[in-house]
Amino acid sequence: IKGISFDVNEGEIVTLIGANGAGKTTTLHAVSRLLKPKQGEISFCGQPISSMEAHKIIQLGLTQVPEGRRVFSQLTVQQNLALGAYTRKDGADAVAADYEMVFQRLPRLKERRRQIAGTLSGGEQQMLAIGRALMCKPKMLLLDEPSMGLSPLLVQEIFSIIHDVNQSGVT
């Protein structure tokens, strides 16, 4: 990818649109530091992050939900959510409150919290991937093809969840 430049303001919902192979996923991977840019600068909340380690970027509040409903399929829903809180240092009470927040936004996950993630439906796995990202306490949530492979009804539900998350202050 060459010559890309964009700003995302706090509270916005921004969409990258382009053909297959245009570089949308590569751009998200560079922003979240899964790929290292060869040149240029990426900043988040006024801080340069181009050479920052991925876990430190997460601690700053930038979290990505990868394409393809990536969950830890052999772990339970609860264990997947716990991994989202792994880098947090704000204490067990804050993490417990965020479990409840995720379960309130995504009630199916509460019903299935002891279920193995690989046995969930595609829509439930996508909800789990979003829930795991929310456990990181993001300021900005990067979603790579959040509706990929979902039925139209589930697409509407996922987009409603994204809207609710945005309304709560997450960019």
Predicted regions and their residues:
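ABC ATPase signature
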Residues: L75, L120, A133-L134
